[in-house]
Design a protein with these regions (language model features):
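GH16 jelly-roll
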Residues: 2-315
Length: 315
């Protein structure tokens, strides 16, 4: 992992922007005009299944760390909570996404083709600003993430035409080192995968525990932000294809050798839960206030203000 001291050398370059009445503001990159194109404020009584699906499989096999059928998803009327669940001596948690790719599809044939039937994506998008407001879990042994993937990532030697994994936020190192991680990976998840360039910064939250994370993805590259501050860039390669959004959690240990490109899954064996999971006091959860996606619009375009009505927050 590459440590980059961006906080000291880069100014605060985001502007606090009120988007909706009675909702938390966004922090948008300065110097550009933005238009909201997709969002979930998580105000309903149930998760919006027109926007989110669950990842339940890993490399064609049922993965014990992924909860099924939105189990562990709690709607508070203001936020969504993704809970860590204990089942005997095993643990799992929800993994939400707006699309799908080959390795999270159960294999449904005994023939040579290693993939099952593709799932229709619920939301795919190219370029723009992707933002989350969230509270991190209290206990170690599992992690949260906000990221982007493409259905064809790694399927072509040229990442620009098949997609890049963009990790906008991962809290792998929060509890042990006080760090949050971001950066890109490409080339798939096997021997061609490339992961250099990830960077970390000090974990910070407001007095109530809320954090903002985002990425400005453009044809020129990726600029990462946390809590109104620009914290890093990664400018090559750049995906020029539509990708889907993930808000995920995962109990550690089941991948055996960490992020090994799925090779342990290829052997159809899983590891055992991280011992730290047994120290967690439940309930523990990753809480999300909103996910928003914005498009950059040309400076000479005049935006019309549309008042969007939402159901009142539940008390």
């Amino acid at each position: 992992m590459v440590e980059i001291d961006n906080v000291k050398t880069r100014p605060v370059v985001q502007i606090k922007t009120t988007i909706f009445d009675d909702e938390a503001p966004s922090y948008l990159p300065a110097g550009k005009k933005w238009k909201l194109v997709w969002h979930d404020e998580f105000n309903g009584k149930e998760i919006d299944k027109t926007k989110w699906m669950c990842r339940e499989s890993f490399w064609g096999q049922d993965f014990p760390a992924f909860a099924h059928n939105f189990e562990g998803v709690e709607m508070t009327g203001k936020t969504v909570r993704l809970h860590l669940l204990r089942k005997g001596n095993d643990f799992c948690s929800p993994h939400l996404q707006t699309g799908s790719l080959t390795y999270d599809i159960p294999k449904d044939t005994k023939g040579f083709w290693p993939f099952g039937k593709m799932r229709k994506p619920l939301f795919m998008h190219k370029y723009g600003y992707y933002e989350i407001r969230c509270k991190q879990p209290k206990y170690a042994g599992w992690h949260s993430a906000f990221w982007l993937q493409a259905p064809g990532v790694g399927s072509n030697p040229d990442a620009s035409v098949c997609g890049v994994e963009t990790d906008i936020m991962e809290n792998y190192r929060q509890h042990n080192h006080g760090k949050i991680i971001a950066g890109n990976g490409w080339g798939g998840y096997g021997k061609d995968s490339k992961w250099f360039g990830h960077f970390s910064w000090d974990y910070e939250a407001d007095k109530d525990g809320w954090c903002y994370y985002g990425v400005d993805w453009s044809p020129k590259g990726y600029t990462f932000y946390a809590n109104g501050k620009k914290i890093g860039e990664q400018n090559s390669p750049v995906s020029n294809v539509e990708q889907f959004v993930l808000v995920s959690t995962e109990a550690r240990g089941y991948r055996k050798i960490g992020n090994d490109g799925g090779l342990s899954a290829g052997r159809r064996t899983w590891g055992k839960p991280d011992p730290k999971l047994f120290e967690a006091v439940l309930p523990d959860f990753f809480e999300v206030d909103f996910v928003r996606v914005y498009d950059e619009v040309p400076q000479d375009v005049k935006l019309t203000k549309e008042r969007i009505k939402f159901p009142k927050k539940f008390k």
